[in-house]
Amino acid sequence: VEKKQLPHMLCVTNLLLHGIEVPSQIVHDNTLARPLRDYTAADRVNVILTNPPFGGIEEPGIEAGFPADVRTKETADLFLVLIQHLLKPGGRAAVVLPDGFLFGEGVKARIKEQLLQHCNLHTIVRLPGGVFAPYTGIKTNLLFFTKGQPTQHIWYYEHPYPPGVKNYNKTKPIRIEEFDAEKAW
């Protein structure tokens, strides 16, 4: 599901170019517009891997589809509530979130509390600046968690720049080889 027209079109075009004749699984819609209570057991999944949009504000009324204690217009916060809801027991998630989520108060704190109580947040990898340049310079984190058990211990790792690198950008992006320390762990 993709809310914005251009990314939706690019995704469908990419699938067509790679031999998927009818990419019917790619829907142009707002995932957050469906009230949480309307999701059933059939909608639950084992794995969610996502980079939800952050820094965005949802259109009026979207937050009404979420429980009162976690209502917000902040897109990334609503996605984290939805992700927790959609995971089956034992389901796993990897989510890219900004620093603002980790250190925020109010609704963010309540969402984090629910995450820690209902999921085992076992790993946080803090990414260096520029990883998503030129689209955003916001510092980001990778959160890995499994639904069904409360959090006991969190492995926190700050991913360093390699020697000689001061920042990432569009022409010099982060490379997969730079994650060897995380893979070895």
Residue ranges and their predicted role:
Residues 1-2:
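Conserved acidic E/D residue at the C-terminus of a beta-strand in Rossmann-like folds
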Residues 6-42:
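S-adenosyl-L-methionine
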